[in-house]
Structures are given as structure tokens and as C-alpha cells.
Amino acid sequence: MEMAKANGWAVVCTSTNTNTVPIYSKYTRCTELRRVDDNDIYKLATILDVNGCWRKLMSIIPKRLDAQACSAPGALNYQEIAAKVGLKYTAQQISLIDGTAERLTPGQSISQVMIDEWKTSGKLNERPTVGVLLQLLVHAEIYSAADFVALHFLNEPKPERPTDGPAAHISLDLCSEDLSEDMDVEDGASYQPNTSALNAAVEQARGTGMNLDYFDKHMVRRDKSVPQQLENGTSSTVPVPPPRAARSSRLLKATASNVAPTTASNAPSASNTANVPNLSILNASSKKLAASSEQTLQPQNIPNLSILNGSSEAVLMATTSTTLDAGKSDNASNGRSSASTSTATIPNVPLITLLIENSSCEISDASDATQITSKSTATKTVPDMSTASYNNLPAISALNLNIASGAGELDGNGAKARGDNADNNSSGTNSLSNDDDEQKEDDDDDDDDDVVDVDDEEADVSLPNLSNSDHNDSSLTTVTCTSGENSFEFTNDSSSASNDDYTNNIPNLSELQQ
């Protein structure tokens, strides 16, 4: 009675004395659902959410029901009432409740929404009670929710279930007697396998490889360098990679390819410099240079002009002398007398006597390099082989005379000495002989003629331009040549500003073959 007053009940159930609620129960069967705590409604709603049980409960609620009269146990005759008054909720209304699930907050349940709607509907006597809820759950065979209401709301025993069917009770407890009967095993039973049978089964399973939890993996090592036997019986050959060149050889090839263009580009300059006489060994006063020049190889930088004359036979090499005068100039080059000694090889002095047409020249060695003669003599004897050769170069060192008797004289018609400013070391003569067959007899008869006729154009070309030498201090060289009664001067500018290359120092070979 006090519990009913506390929950707001206006009328107390007075049907019979047996329906009295125990004093310690939380709710009575006549307690309206709107008076039940929200926490208890929430727990009940979580059970009804399983498998959509709330739809089954909502579909069997009667339309008009005297809740207070039907709250007692067994007082609700559902079949008669449902046929008389009908159902309260239709399928469309159930779908509306189902549509609210999308708008629910995380703490709400759709079954709770259904209970909230049901407990607040109807008149005073038509509002649902805990007793009506328990009887409808049993009629809908939702026994899990019915057990929760009987135990937690009313403190009553669980409602009875049918003995058969899905709603029948399923016991999960095992009786000790039943368990002992199931666990009894005879010692001499034939179905118990022995050790030999177990080992045989293991061996059989190992052979078939069936139902193995683990297995041993044995790796077979193979030497890949040895050809393996194939299935068809033939042996496969091991592929051998091609030999690879060593790193050092590849570097050498790369270096050679890089050096080759440089060598080719430097070749023209080397050919030009090799054709210039090495004037550093022309100083006869240095004995060291003379000795070293004898040991070096003879550079064949001057063409062998003696073989260019097809009409001449074996030409003997010698040195001829022709009077030359150094031009008057402060920078005039030192005059030198060419008296080169010949060895077995062809001398390096161009055979200018071959330049005259139809000439068959024979060059004789001058016996004395310091003697200035007005008559060129030709001998047919081979020069002394023991004479020292300065690298097959013109014996220009003989022009630097250190003796006092080496004063230069010029003989000829109208030839006059112009070396007044030259000392003994800078004075000298360069004798050139260019006699043809027709002039030999005239030269023998005329002893007064000291100078041999030389063609002007050929002499200019054939004379070596020694002013291009690195050791020649003179940048301007003037040479005076005498031909018969005429004399002419040849000036060669070898200054650093000149554009002449070394090729101007080589005789014009196109004019040699006449």
C-alpha cells in the first residue's frame, strides 16, 4: 500500500487476498508504466531491441482495455478482447516508429520510443500497467523480457513456459549422475588405440602429407656450376658470360682516345718546327754542344734534293762557297762561311746547283772553311768520312770565325765589302756555286770572275731564312748577291710581328725538276 502511494497510484488492487504484493517488491502489477523509472524502462528496451521484438509486442496491443481489471495474473483474455475491441496499432504506425530510428541520439533506443508512446496513451483506466505488460510478453512468447519484468519489477518467479516448441525451457546445467554415466569408460574396450596403432597412423599420415600441423623441410644443396640432368636425359650447359675487359684496360683506351685528337692537332706544328735548323749547336766555340751533336741522330728534315734531278747520276756531296755580304744594319745578322763536312749521309745543305736547267752538278768540299775564294771548284771525290757532322745540319758554325785572319772580302765586278761594323766573329762569307755545263769552261778561262751566276728568283727561294731561328738576334737580315755585272740586295724581315711561317725557309721544290 505504501509502495503504491509512493508511485502515485490512486486506486489499489483489491480483487483477492492472494494478489497482494510483497512488501519488498519495487512495483506492483497495478503500477502504471509511466510511473516506472527510466532506467528500468531502458534496460527493458535493450532486451526488446534484439531481433526487433518490440514490433511483435506493439502489433498485439489491444485498442481499448481495462488495464486495472486485467492486471491480475490470468485475468487477461487476449483472444476475446482482441476480437471484441480490435488492435491499437496498425502496420503503418509501426513503420512510423521504425522511421524514428534515424533521428535517435546515441543514448536512446527505438524500443524505448515505443514504450514511451504506449504508456502515455489512453484514458485513466486504459493506461497500461506492469501486470498487463507481463501478460502481453508471455502471449507474444518474448520470455527473456517476461523473465526480466517478473524478477526485477515484481520480484516474482519466472512465468511457466511450454514443454515443447521453441519457447520450451533449455537447461544448461548437467546433473552429476548423468555426467558420471557419460564419463564411465571400460578399461578393456577395443576402441582404445594402442601405441603401435598410433605410430602406424603417424607414418601413414606422413607419407600422404595429410592433416600435418608441421613438417620438416630438408633443403637439397645443388652446385649451380655443374650442369644438372634434365627430365629428357640431356644435360643443360651453364651459360658463360662474355669476358669483360679489365678496368685498367678500359681506362687506357679512354685515355688513348682522348690523347689521339691532341696528338693529331699538334702534328702540323711539329712538322713546321722540325724543318728549322737547330741553331743552338752552331756555336763552334762550345765543345760540349759539338760533342753532343755528334751523338744525336741525324734529323732528315731537309729534302734530299740530289735525287730530284733525273738527269744527274751519283752526285757527290761537298760544300761550295760563294761570297755573300751582310747588309748594313745595326741588327744585321752575322755572316758565316758554310763549310759543312759530309758523312755517309746526304748533307743538309740544299743542292742549289741543281736548280739551273740542264745542270749536272758535282759539289766538292772546300778544304779551308775560312778561305774566301772567287772561284768555285768542284771535286768528284767523296768527302772524308771521319769529319764530324753536327746533326746533318749546315755547318753554319764555321761561319763564326774566331781567328784573326777571317776578315771578309768580296771579289767580283762592282762587289764591295759592306761589313765595316762587323767584327771578326760577325764577318764571314757564304759561298754558293751554281755553275752549269756551259759556264764551266768560261770559269776556267776567266780567273778574274769571282762570283758564279745565280738565278735571282731561284736564289731568293733556296736560301735558308736563318733569321727565323730562336738564337738569331737580328730581326732584319739583308743579303747582297752579285751576278755578273749586276748586284742586288735581298732583305728578310724575321721580326716577331712577321707572319712568315717556317715553310718559307724550305726551297721551292716545284722548280727543282726542270
Swiss-Prot record:
The keyword Translocase does not apply. Coiled coil: none annotated. Residues 226-250, 255-274, 324-343, 366-385, 413-514 are annotated as: Disordered. SUPFAM superfamilies: DEATH domain (SSF47986). Residues 422-433, 477-514 have a biased composition (Polar residues). Keywords: Cytoplasm, Developmental protein, Repeat, Transducer. Gene3D superfamilies: Death Domain, Fas (1.10.533.10). It holds the Pfam family Death_2. One of its GO terms (biological process) is signal transduction. Residues 434-460 have a biased composition (Acidic residues). It is found in: Cytoplasm. Maternal and zygotic gene product. The keyword Repeat applies. Residues 259-274 have a biased composition (Low complexity). InterPro entries: DEATH-like_dom_sf, Death_dom, Tube_Death. It comes from the Eukaryota. One of its GO terms (cellular component) is cytoplasm. Required for the determination of embryonic dorsoventral polarity. Is involved in transduction of information regulating nuclear import of dorsal protein. This is Protein Tube. It comes from Drosophila virilis (Fruit fly).
